Each structure stands twice: as C-alpha cells, then as structure tokens.
C-alpha cells in the first residue's frame, strides 16, 4: 500500500474531522490483522501500510483482550487502571510517529504529544505513590462493584466494559491527535490554540495542587491514626483529621477539584483537534463526553461509599459542589467541624 491508500486526501482542514473522509473509508483495513497473524505482513509493513486510526483500533482491541486475560488469571480487576495514565499518550505518540514518518507532523501535533506526555508523567507518578503499581493492588471500587452486581452480569461487565470499552475509550481520547495529524499545517498554530494550551496548563496545575493536597491530608490522617501525632510539615488540626475526609484547600470549594481539572484537560485536547480542523463539533467529542459520563458514574459510587463511612460527608455534599464551586459561595468551614463535634 502507499500513503494514498492509507491516509485520506485532505482538501480542506475540515476534511480531517469528517468521519466519512478520515475514518470509514479505511475500516476495511481491519482485515490487515489477519495478514499480520498469518505472516503475510511483518509488523513494520502492517504498521506503515495500514491507516493509523485503524492500527490504533486493532491494537486497543488486542490490548483489551490481553488485559482481560491477565485480570482473569490474577483475579485482579485493576489491570486497565495501571495503564490508564499511559495509554492515551502512547496512542497519541503513535499518531506523532506516523506523522513524522510521512513528514506531515505539524507544530500543533508535537505540542499535543508533549502536553499528553506531561499529563502521563504526572498521573503515573501520582498513581505510583498511592500504591497503584504494588503487587496485588486493586481499586476498592471494583471490589464494591463485584459485591453489588448480579453474578451472571459481572463476567460480561468485566470483559466488555472494564477491558474492551475502557481501552477503546482511552484510545478514542487520543483521537483529536489523529485529526491534528491529518490537518497538518492547513491552519497555523494561532490564538485559539494558545487558549487551548492555557486551559491545559491551568488545569494541569490545578489537578497537581488538588492531588498534592489530597495526598498530604491522607498522609497526615494515616500518621495520626497510627501514633496519634501529626508531623510538623502537615498543617491540620485534630478536628480536620477526625472528619476523615479532606475538606481543606481546594476541597473547601469543590468535592472533586482534581476530577474537574481532569475533565477540562481532555476538553483542551478536544479543542486542539477542533481548532486544527476548523470544526467546533466533530466525532471525537463523544470520547470526551464519555469521559464526563465515566466521572459522573464513578463519583456517585465513591460518594455513596464515603457517606457510609463518614457521618459528615452528607453535610459536605450539601455545602460544597461536586465539581464546580457553588454559585452562592457555599463552602466548608471550620465551624462545620465544630458543629459536628457538638452533635456527636
């Protein structure tokens, strides 16, 4: 195959965002996987002679099945969780490498790949320090899901949602990079790109601060629970620690500022693709909307468990917005801890 048979012909920037131009004409190349497995194509030929979006689809499906097999073997559901900070960036780098190989990589494409690498490095480190990569570590929410879901449904949920859908979703989150690659330099990096870049950087710093505040609080709480002392580097009083959950710093105003930042980070990546293709709305927005849906569902489960564990959490829900701060300025204050002490 040639470049003409693996890449769409782009007559205008908007063509890069059209499903019927950029994706559907190449879905027949899914059959190239059979050629690879039968030895009729080596991997290099398969990689460079198959549409890059189709390559990503095939690799994500294969990886989802591999992770499902590992999960069944280890009886641990967090296999995808371990790769969550890595896969979107890996898929974006796939598009970057393809663009470099065919000399169509734009400044915008390189910036997107760099920003996603920053995102990946930070999230991987945060997941590592929380013990996510420890042998046998598993997200407590999956344990709860297994408990509440009918036994006959869970195997289907375990395969199709946790592994196939989630890996495919992580791939689709990187799809704006595909659009940016196709658009090339049809639209120069300009003011709107800078706005998307600034949105990313602001939310990146916000999420980093929120995660650090969360880490500091639970480190102090766990330390106090062990030996009834709080290291001097932590500035928490006993009322705050006795509450059991973090309601200080950014968490005074938002119950999940890190989740808010994460959703807006991926909105910024969507915007890069929309700007590159001059298409404010295109098919890649469904990946971002899917991420919003995932956060809605996982947050509901997390908060249900928090309400069962911490008596004050329902009060916290009433006073503080889930993601965005309340318009009326309502937030958590020290008097809320004092009031709870009196009630107890």
Swiss-Prot record:
It is a multi-pass membrane protein. GO terms for molecular function: steroid dehydrogenase activity. Its main location: endoplasmic reticulum. It is found in: Endoplasmic reticulum membrane. Keywords: Endoplasmic reticulum, Membrane, Transmembrane, Transmembrane helix. InterPro entries: UstE-like. GO terms for biological process: steroid metabolic process. GO terms for cellular component: endoplasmic reticulum; endoplasmic reticulum membrane; membrane. The keyword Hydrolase does not apply. It comes from the Eukaryota. The chain crosses the membrane at residues 53-73, 84-104, 153-173, 189-209, 275-295. Belongs to the steroid 5-alpha reductase family. PANTHER family: 3-OXO-5-ALPHA-STEROID 4-DEHYDROGENASE, 3-OXO-5-ALPHA-STEROID 4-DEHYDROGENASE (DUF1295). This is Uncharacterized protein C594.04c. It comes from Schizosaccharomyces pombe (strain 972 / ATCC 24843) (Fission yeast).
